[in-house]
């Protein structure tokens, strides 16, 4: 990306990076906050800030190797300047960049990345080893390379209010061009990155932003109008809203989560979408699950996971993840499967899904569960790898309960 030589933009970038790297802020949230801090920035300014923050977060380890030191709060300007030197850009003649030596940076980059895949592709050693152990080095290396690509913005047409062709036309009238995707009936891809949340089409509830891979999960559950469906880890409701559309607003969806604030957000989104068959339930005790035992035609368990399938979209997670967290999340996944599967009625079904691509979070968890619960049978499963699909990575398994 070409440099925009305005100091206030670089102040915004370095402030955002400090909060992401040293104050545990999520990159997407911090970028949004930074962009809101100066209403005078135009679209090019905002794009420059967002892209630079995402790029430098994504390539953190490689940039550090080229700097010859780890990034710290007091060398963030040097860190950002190093990135632009590696991109072949000429830095502004500012005091903050005076220490940077282009020749040394390029030499260190060559030395440190030539024979070290983890440095070159900017991934922690432990995470590279984990993925290589589970998927095999060749497969994992392709996935790591794909993680470093920029993610497309994909939206899902809200069938309750419009169809894909009409939505394309409405967005085009607002200056936004989109393309369709084969095998994804409701998906549109934006040709250029833009803030679609400001469009009238979004305010009218005609679409939601949702990755193409994620859009397959609600379909995988095979819901029908009139069913009783539980989305047990609903969060802010991306898949809940899709289920409502697939059910044509008929039947009952219980959207559940342990975080009440997420359900509050879901209610707002449901109102905008015209989704009227959703009832939220805050999981604040085991009684909430017990009341629904053996009652649901379908249960969706989109469980918490490592998120290794969505690093392209959330590059800061590479630096926030720990082996301890992944081990704990696997225990949580099994616990959710054990407890929440009780809501499936005889003859009903559940879908277990994650945005991870690790077998230890996916196929292995399903296998363990079925061995302990022979009343459930694996009917179908799907693994989406970002390197093959071009979109986020997901796993989904459809389990049927005996009548």
What are these regions (language model features)?
Residues 1-403:
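S-adenosylmethionine
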